[in-house]
């Protein structure tokens, strides 16, 4: 006989400070939110990415509200995207430097412009996706909708968007030189800096930093190729290369969003652990107490780290935060 105590009946209430943090959610349902375009990017070129993206998020949230996993079946993918195939698998093979990571390689722009010169941009799908990317970076907002999603939900199409960003910049440089790259970067960096402020997820902010780093390295390469800069170049670059401001590097919104995901999915805890869903596990787990512990040990510490200056972080970054 095995006795398993039902610890779940002694679960805690949600901490008041958590309730307060979650009481003012950001509304992603605003005009000009690029997040919907991200979710619609995988659709066939004939479909409107914005319309598809809204339908995808609505489908995911509707399933979560009914207690189902917020994921898409093959049939749902076919109906929403117009296909179940990955339509963006071929052009990255033609231009492999589109996947070049600026964190690991400082020569991404050089490699990509060489590949574009050897094989000019002509793929119909790629040209359609570049047009979609142009639309994305014209949007005034990028706010991920994390409401009523779970840990199995698909992310926005961050990877393909990064690849398109690099191709977009390389094409501008190859066609119009430094002037073209500066003009392209003005629009690109404006969008990504806005995303750095509004992004509701940590992965979104990491992707944004990657995109900005790629833009900076591209500009650095192009500037280095110029024998001298004109006064107009210098003026535009000074405007473009302003340091990030405190509100642009604040990660509180992303941490709160991570906390919200934990709170909304705490009753499905056993669905996400390797042991699987079982009655003994249901007895042993205190879902809300686990969320409270996660908040005190991780989220609250993240808030404290976010308030440190660069020098303080490097000096104290390995010190436990109480």
Regions inferred by a protein language model and the residue ranges of each:
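Short acidic linear motifs
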Residues: 1-322
